[in-house]
Amino acid sequence: GQGGGAGGEKAKTTTGTTNTNTNTNATTPWLYPNIRVRVVDKKASKGRYYLKKGTIVDVKTPETCDVFIDDFREVVQDLHQRQLETVVPKGEGGAVLCVAGKWKGRQGTLLRRNRKSDYVACQLEDEAEILKLHLDDVCELVVSEK
């Protein structure tokens, strides 16, 4: 016998799900121009850019972008946000952009980075208080020298 499990119609798929509370990076667009990202997809360009850092130069759709890869000094087109991850500044005082959560779209400064936890201390522009933000919610921002 093949272990008669009653496999079947338990998982009914419903269209038009009303669960709006799913806060997953897979679905929420977080791409912005001028933020630093790392390529985490081994298949992207046959692995040539795997774990390489770059800067988003153009956001084409909410989930795809063109990235200038530092090491190769070239632009890779149409990378999906699933293929990328955020990069947090190494040093304190680095410019950051909130890419998710309550403060999405706001710029600020990295004050402290705790290597033992997944949180950083940031001060956003026009905010007096220091905020504790999750690493995935902030990203290094490339500020052009004026």
Each model region followed by its residue ranges:
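Generic preference for hydrophobic/aromatic residues in regular secondary structure cores
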Residues: G1, L84-T86, V138
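Intrinsic disorder/low-complexity signal
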Residues: G1-A26, W30, V142-K146
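Basic/aromatic-rich interaction segments and small domains that mediate binding to polyanionic partners
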Residues: A11-G16, L31-D78, G94-E140, S144
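Short, intrinsically disordered linker segments that flank or connect zinc-binding domains
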Residues: N23-A26, H80-V87
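Short nucleic-acid-contacting surface segments enriched for D/E, G, S/T with interspersed K/R
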Residues: P89-E92
